[in-house]
């Protein structure tokens, strides 16, 4: 198994569900924008949200950090909706709550595997856009990403609204 794997376009959504299902102790997510509600009966981003909620129910610590500043268009509104939906299902959700934009997109599973790249958890990003992310298993890199997540989590606060 390679220490890095390129996930182009829809390859991300074909790999992430199994990674989420395999989580044993922790899932850490950072997203610029997350859309879990919408008109589509089956949205890929909603499926990821459902998997996060199921893992939280199973006792896995699930932490989601969303952007709250800037972003224009609908990002803050979509993030508030996603935060409420996730919190109602036992997921810890926070925001940096500053004037600085958190544009990172990151997923860390059990401190052992991480994905970092351009994929937001929205139907467009997961199904239509030209996105690229990298799956990393190299533990020094994953450890550094985990440390970065934990630093952001410490200065974050619950998303209000």
Predicted stretch roles:
Residues 1-18, 143:
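Aromatic-Pro/Gly-enriched surface loop or interdomain linker
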Residues 9, 108-161:
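Signature of lipid phosphatidyltransferase scaffolds
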Residues 98-101, 127:
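Short solvent-exposed loop/turn micro-motifs enriched in small/polar/acidic residues
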